Design a protein with these regions (language model features):
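Hydrophobic alpha-helical segments
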Residues: 1-182
Length: 182
């Protein structure tokens, strides 16, 4: 309906998410962290092919909300995820928070990651209000879908599973209380 809106999103996705200065895998983890936090099933059930090709595994997505306590994430990933967490949940950011980020990222990387998280969060909240489901748009396409969501039938089965990440009775959409590991 509004071509400029489409192109704004498409250009941001290409220039900031796909390309950009920060590690793509880190941006992908932050994107899914936001999805899990705001319960955007549309975005949370997609995966970056580029991130998968560079080593991100499906297990890396499984418990992002509890990233601080998990050994699967390195200190750089945890720092970036803490940035996504602070933006998503409006957490206070003190000097120690910024020192942690600056230990792992340049100023341009921090700007890009912060911008990407902010854009992602707004876009995901908007998509959630539209209640758009995969396979309603571009039916028959399976590109970038998470395992178990490649077809309309698979999506329905996965969403019925007891351990589906976006079930309303899960603890996914709860403001985190974790603190950075010492």
């Amino acid at each position: 309906h509004v071509p400029a809106t489409f192109w704004s999103f498409a250009n941001t996705w290409r220039d900031v998410f796909k390309n950009g200065v920060a590690d793509h895998k880190i941006k992908e983890l932050c994107r899914i962290y936001v999805s899990r936090s705001v319960l955007c099933e549309f975005c949370g059930n997609q995966r970056s092919i580029k991130a998968a090709k560079s080593g991100l595994k499906e297990d890396d997505y499984s418990d992002l909300i509890n990233f601080e306590s998990l050994s699967r994430y390195d200190e750089r990933q945890k720092a970036a995820l803490s940035y996504a967490e602070a933006i998503t949940w409006d957490l206070p950011c003190d000097d120690a928070f910024w020192a942690r980020l600056h230990k792992h990222f340049s100023e341009p990387e921090l700007v890009e990651i912060g911008y990407f998280v902010a854009i992602t969060m707004g876009q995901q909240r908007w998509l959630r209000t539209l209640n758009i489901e995969h396979h309603q748009i571009l039916a028959g396409q399976d590109g970038s879908m998470a395992p178990g969501f490649e077809t309309e039938e698979a999506l329905k089965r996965s969403k019925q599973a007891a351990d589906y990440w976006a079930k309303k009775d899960t603890k996914i959409n709860v403001k985190p209380t974790t603190q950075p590991a010492e």
